């Protein structure tokens, strides 16, 4: 029995990046031997065990043979005769197919993953890459993480991804897995690389057709020097990742705030009147299809519907601003206003030449919300008001607080 550290922990150590969970592969053992040493079996589709002390996952070396369509259609062989090289061959990318001997620290790199790390190239291990459609998503997600480190996608890997998209292999992706990879990509430093990688492979139209439809739609060059709405969206996503690192909630709202521009009649281009209202329907459809969690849906719909109002905050009447806060449920969910401000700032700065622009509307929105939030129903009830009187007085007092905060700049 030999034990090796594999996958992301080895890769990240070589990149001198923070490592996440450690994964181990065991060569030359079977389930009975693992259990005899105290390992607890937990795998359903293939033999995976938890270490009796560390709780880390240890998997028996295995091969996988394609037996059907999609990412579940595999026959697994975890016989003790399976070699380390055979186990590494089934992995997706060369940089993830490096193993380190637990005892000696020696690296095993049969597919030149170290060379690709040094060259900053994301490359598939072998032809079996095309057998699992999830690997297209993983390639895009890894690019979102690694592009800031200078990585590019190998041309032959990009070609395989295009073949998979053209062949309909991506149709078998389940919504939960698409959402899982999208959410992780939105937590990375450069989400635009996720979008661009999928778009270039003609896979975005299958995975996120509502976002793919933005590419090629022109905007007014005086407001958007980048012109193409798809490019604008890439820039917004990257700015959002800078403003709120690792925050997929803000990232998803930023990603979907402009979906309505894809529905603007071509005769109206490059203007997009009412796009903030048109965008709600495709956003809801996307959320239903991918089974997006409610907190993500709600913030995204708010950002889609309200971002233009926040941009023109100074023009809004006090009562109109209060109505915006109510639509955001900002008195019960006050955190939404800071999140909305981040999305709107990303939208404003996600334009060529505006990447470092100031966005005073964000701080103003938070300040005015805080003033209104300081007024509460308990204080009014203490004054003897009851029932509907409290609601009416609360609205009036909050609007007055917004007006006072505007006048004093407090």
From Swiss-Prot:
CTP binds at residues 8, 11, 91, 138, 141. One of its GO terms (biological process) is RNA repair. Mg(2+) binds at residues 21, 23. GO terms for molecular function: ATP binding; CCA tRNA nucleotidyltransferase activity; cyclic-nucleotide phosphodiesterase activity; magnesium ion binding; phosphatase activity; tRNA binding. ATP binds at residues 8, 11, 91, 138, 141. Keywords: ATP-binding, Hydrolase, Magnesium, Metal-binding, Multifunctional enzyme, Nickel, Nucleotide-binding, Nucleotidyltransferase, RNA repair, RNA-binding, Transferase, tRNA processing. Residues 229-347 form the HD domain. Its cofactor is Mg(2+); Ni(2+). The keyword RNA-binding applies. It catalyses: a tRNA precursor + 2 CTP + ATP = a tRNA with a 3' CCA end + 3 diphosphate; a tRNA with a 3' CCA end + 2 CTP + ATP = a tRNA with a 3' CCACCA end + 3 diphosphate. Magnesium is required for nucleotidyltransferase activity. Its EC number is 2.7.7.72, 3.1.3.-, 3.1.4.-. A single active site specifically recognizes both ATP and CTP and is responsible for their addition. Belongs to the tRNA nucleotidyltransferase/poly(A) polymerase family. Bacterial CCA-adding enzyme type 1 subfamily. Monomer. Can also form homodimers and oligomers. NCBIfam families: PRK10885.1. HAMAP family: CCA_bact_type1 (MF_01261). Catalyzes the addition and repair of the essential 3'-terminal CCA sequence in tRNAs without using a nucleic acid template. Adds these three nucleotides in the order of C, C, and A to the tRNA nucleotide-73, using CTP and ATP as substrates and producing inorganic pyrophosphate. tRNA 3'-terminal CCA addition is required both for tRNA processing and repair. Also involved in tRNA surveillance by mediating tandem CCA addition to generate a CCACCA at the 3' terminus of unstable tRNAs. While stable tRNAs receive only 3'-terminal CCA, unstable tRNAs are marked with CCACCA and rapidly degraded. Comprises two domains: an N-terminal domain containing the nucleotidyltransferase activity and a C-terminal HD domain associated with both phosphodiesterase and phosphatase activities. This is Multifunctional CCA protein.
């Amino acid at each position: 029995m030999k034990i090796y550290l594999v996958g992301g922990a080895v890769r990240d150590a070589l990149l001198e990046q923070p490592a996440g969970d450690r994964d181990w592969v065991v060569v030359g053992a079977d389930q009975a031997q693992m259990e005899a040493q105290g390992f607890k079996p937990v795998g359903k589709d293939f033999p995976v065990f938890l270490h009796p002390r560390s709780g880390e996952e240890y998997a028996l070396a295995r091969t996988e043979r394609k037996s059907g369509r999609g990412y579940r259609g595999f026959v697994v062989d975890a016989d003790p005769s399976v070699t380390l090289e055979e186990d590494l061959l089934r992995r997706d990318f060369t940089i993830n197919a490096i193993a380190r001997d637990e005892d000696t620290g020696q690296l095993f790199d049969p597919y030149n993953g170290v060379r690709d790390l040094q060259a900053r190239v994301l490359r598939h291990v072998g032809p079996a890459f095309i057998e699992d459609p999830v690997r297209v998503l993983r390639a895009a997600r890894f690019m979102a993480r690694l592009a800031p480190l200078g990585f590019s996608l190998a041309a032959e890997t990009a070609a395989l991804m295009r073949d998979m998209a053209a062949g309909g292999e991506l149709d078998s992706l389940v919504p939960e897995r698409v959402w899982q990879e999208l959410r992780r990509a939105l937590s990375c430093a450069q989400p635009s690389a996720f979008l661009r990688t999928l778009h270039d492979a003609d896979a975005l139209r299958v995975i996120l057709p509502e976002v793919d439809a933005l590419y090629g739609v022109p905007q007014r060059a005086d407001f958007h020097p980048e012109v193409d709405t798809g490019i604008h969206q890439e820039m917004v996503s990257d700015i959002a990742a800078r403003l709120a690192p690792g925050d997929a909630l803000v990232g998803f709202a930023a990603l979907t705030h402009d979906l309505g521009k894809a529905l603007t009649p071509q005769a109206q281009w490059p203007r997009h009147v009412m796009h903030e209202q048109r965008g709600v329907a495709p956003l809801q459809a996307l959320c239903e299809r991918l089974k997006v969690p409610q907190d993500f849906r709600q913030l995204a719909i708010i950002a889609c519907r309200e971002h233009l109002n926040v941009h023109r905050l100074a023009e809004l009447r006090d009562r109109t601003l209060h109505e915006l806060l109510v639509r955001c449920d900002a008195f019960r969910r006050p955190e939404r206003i800071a999140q909305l401000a981040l999305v709107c700032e990303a939208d404003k700065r996600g334009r060529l030449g505006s990447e470092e622009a100031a966005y005073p509307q964000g701080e103003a929105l938070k300040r005015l919300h805080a003033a209104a939030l300081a007024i509460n129903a308990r204080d009014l009830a203490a004054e003897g008001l009851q029932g509907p009187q409290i609601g009416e007085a609360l609205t009036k007092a909050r609007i007055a607080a917004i007006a006072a905060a505007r006048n004093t700049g407090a």
